[in-house]
């Protein structure tokens, strides 16, 4: 689908349970009331350049609510359906210096008059010139060389602004690149707010700032969180050849997982089902670690996990100045299987490389606090991952995203197929396929943390275990590679070793991972 088609979620949104501000259509940033507008009037389009060479289209927000003002226009690549939004704002300061002000002038950022591109006539991109004490948070796009009217847009009082940065590339041609924007600081306690507008050329408009954080009345309460999970909980498909499935944490503990203490390796301790006897807090200092049962039969059984006794663990957090809710859904796998490499036309098993005990993977749903609409899904892929617009996600049973878990490594992907870490000739395989083994995360989830709700959600003891969920394994990479390199042409041996050694230790299997709470995404944005 192209931008000519507007994207809508497959099913209408439900009526959310009552609360203080979530889903109410507007959010008060502390004297600046903002609303999310997703209806647009097309201004101009290019038919080439940008992602996939398909061009980009620029829009003016329309159907702006009474009393609200435009802060900037919207741009999007043409290689996806129209699924955008911008914030519009209303001054509710009740006296004092106004939160919004018209610009005093415009400067021309770029014109396509002399650009030799396929385009709908000429376009002019303008930067507002603010009066003292105000900043622009967006650009204006026109099809006329005349400057826009001064009341076309509003600049924002400086204390309602924060530092922004570029995010995704929208479009570019000689002398100009256009990007979407986001706040530079994006932790759970940061107050920067995305405006939905774009950045063009060298000018970097600010983003907004929520002066009401850290009191996020716009965030969902517990009944609303449960309703969001009923609406958007993903389906996870496992590869038909997957041997190592997820389980619940209590199942792992009660089936023989052991707690080891440095210096007392000969006497590991069984673990209580809630993890009550695990050391709490601290850091990853090698003093403690978990491992599989010592009995070989039990070890092999626990490695395989138990999908019938599996729970998805949910962490809910405010993002982008509490204008969005991130719902991270964490899956625990007792064991991560061995890696495989693609070498030209061959698939080669890499021995013990990639094996490790205790594998935590997650998917994150980014939901608008204005209306409860799912906007993006984050697919974690080992130490990094990628955000995917809801318009590019596969859905099943209404508005539930489909996730594909890679064979042995359990990385999450939005579509089936092969993704290589490395080059097209040689790399580590991440294979996904829609097998018959599938998990409905909405059928078995546990909300383990929502810090902004205070004592409403009680965190289980295992969540505050800061050490590794598997032992550190020191195996000889060169020795493991030597076992497989005899099948390879000589020129590719060094290249394979380079790819393998570039993998992070958690992926290599040299050390067990820490739990969800000790990832930097727990209190920050996802890595992408």
Language model features with spans:
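Residue-level detector of short, conserved catalytic/binding motifs and their immediate flanks
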Residues: 56-57, 123-124, 325-327, 361-363, ...
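A domain-level signal for the mature, folded cores of soluble proteins
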Residues: 12, 16-19, 26, 203-359, ...
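Eukaryotic beta-rich interaction modules
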Residues: 38-44, 48-53, 67, 308-310, ...
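Short, surface-exposed polybasic-aromatic patches that bind anionic ligands, especially phosphate groups
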Residues: 68-76, 85, 101-105, 137-140
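Short, flexible domain-boundary/linker segments around small modular repeats
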Residues: 11-58, 88-123, 152-177
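Amphipathic alpha-helical packing elements
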Residues: 63, 68-71, 118-149
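Short beta-strand micro-motifs enriched in acidic
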Residues: 366-370
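Long terminal segments
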Residues: 161-217
């Amino acid at each position: 689908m192209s931008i000519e088609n507007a994207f809508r979620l497959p099913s209408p949104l439900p009526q959310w349970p009552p609360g203080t501000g979530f889903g109410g259509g507007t959010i008060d940033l502390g004297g600046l009331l903002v609303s999310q507008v997703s209806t647009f009037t097309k201004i101009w389009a290019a038919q080439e350049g940008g992602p996939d060479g398909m061009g980009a289209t620029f829009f003016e927000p329309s159907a702006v609510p009474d009393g609200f003002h435009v802060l900037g226009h919207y741009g999007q690549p043409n290689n996806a359906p129209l699924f955008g939004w911008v914030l519009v704002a209303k001054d509710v300061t009740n006296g004092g210096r106004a939160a919004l002000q018209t610009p005093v002038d415009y400067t021309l950022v770029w014109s396509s008059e002399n650009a030799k591109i396929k385009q709908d006539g000429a376009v002019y991109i303008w930067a507002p010139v603010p009066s003292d004490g105000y900043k622009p948070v967006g650009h204006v796009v026109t099809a006329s060389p005349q400057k826009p009217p001064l009341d076309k847009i509003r600049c924002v009082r400086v204390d309602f602004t924060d530092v922004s940065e570029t995010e995704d590339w929208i479009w570019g041609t000689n002398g100009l690149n256009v990007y979407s924007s986001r706040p530079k600081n994006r932790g759970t306690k940061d107050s920067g707010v995305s405006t939905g507008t774009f950045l063009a050329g060298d000018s970097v408009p600010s983003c907004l700032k929520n002066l009401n954080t850290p009191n996020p009345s716009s965030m969902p309460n517990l009944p609303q969180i449960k309703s969001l999970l009923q609406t958007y909980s993903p389906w996870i498909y496992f590869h038909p050849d997957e041997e190592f499935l997820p389980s619940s944490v209590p199942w792992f503990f009660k089936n023989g997982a052991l707690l080891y203490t440095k210096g007392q390796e000969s006497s590991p301790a069984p673990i209580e089902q809630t993890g009550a006897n695990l050391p709490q807090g601290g850091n990853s200092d090698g003093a403690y670690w978990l491992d599989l049962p010592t009995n070989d039969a039990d070890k092999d059984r626990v490695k395989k996990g138990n999908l019938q006794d599996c729970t998805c663990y949910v962490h809910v957090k405010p993002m982008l100045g509490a204008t969005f809710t991130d719902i991270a859904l964490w899956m625990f796998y007792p064991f991560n299987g061995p890696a495989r490499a693609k070498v030209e036309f061959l698939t080669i098993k890499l021995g013990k490389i990639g094996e490790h005990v205790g594998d935590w993977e997650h998917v994150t749903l980014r939901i608008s606090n204005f209306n409860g609409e799912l906007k993006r899904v984050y697919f974690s892929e080992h130490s990094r991952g990628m955000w995917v617009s809801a318009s590019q996600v596969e859905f099943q049973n209404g508005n539930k995203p489909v996730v594909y878990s890679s064979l042995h490594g359990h990385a999450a992907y939005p579509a089936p197929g092969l993704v290589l870490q490395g080059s097209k000739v040689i790399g580590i395989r991440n294979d996904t396929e829609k097998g018959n083994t599938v998990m409905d995360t909405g059928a078995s989830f546990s909300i383990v943390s929502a810090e902004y709700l205070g004592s409403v959600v009680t965190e289980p003891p295992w969540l505050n275990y800061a050490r590794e969920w598997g032992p550190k394994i020191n195996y000889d990479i060169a020795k493991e590679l030597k076992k497989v390199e005899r099948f390879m042409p000589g020129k590719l041996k060094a290249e394979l070793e380079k790819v393998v050694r570039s993998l992070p230790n958690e992926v290599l299997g040299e050390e067990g991972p820490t739990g969800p709470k000790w990832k930097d995404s727990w209190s920050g944005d996802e890595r992408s």
